[in-house]
Amino acid sequence: MWVSPSRIIRLRRAGAWRDFRDHRIITRVAEHSNPSPPSPPLCDVLASLRAATAEQHARLDQAMPLSGSTPTLDDYRDHLLILRAWLAPLERWLARFGDGPQDAARLPSVPRASLLEQDLAHPAMPSGGMAVDEIDVATLRGDAAYRWGVCYVIEGSQLGGAVLYRQLSRQLAPHPLDYLGAGKTPGPRWQQFLQALRANVQEPADIALACAGAQRTFNDLLARVPACASSGTR
């Protein structure tokens, strides 16, 4: 998860820098701790995905409702409303497939939209919030490589969720933050995903498709964040 210098300053002021630093260490260890194939592809899909989405990731990191220095439950509600409009239709669309990242033998399915609904319905959650239109999945490509890129963004979002849970679980109590808490230990799942991604997306054409899927997925999310939507997405 890319983090700007200003975000680092805010984390330090909030006393959460150690949590974030630990998260970065866990993430890197998760990516590299298990043995890898002796000769990785010359064109690495993970490096390509990171480069293709770095700008979008940076913009999103600054603009989501929970990115402020003192988030409230109102901010968490709006955060979930944005994610629901993005994630729920994506999960329904991905459920139509049984190959690529949707092959349960490669990566077991982990539905997350139901946790969003559960958190939104919790008695501690303030009522109201913004109206957010669901993304349009009709023009998404069905290629397996493209879906690997889509899932790269979805799976990666759980890493940030783990950091947010550690930062906010006390601050936003008594709300349990079940959606964020579901990713408290994302390392093993993320490692499993990366191994499957690298094993199945190696050809340059497939890597390009994965990057296109990831960029589209980021753009669909950015378009639902008021601070980004007002300035347009690229």
Language model features with spans:
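Compositionally biased, low-complexity segments
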Residues: M1-W2, V29
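Low-acidity, Ser/Thr- and Arg-rich intrinsically disordered low-complexity segments
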Residues: W2-R13
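Metal- and O2-centered redox machinery and metal/ROS homeostasis
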Residues: D19-R234
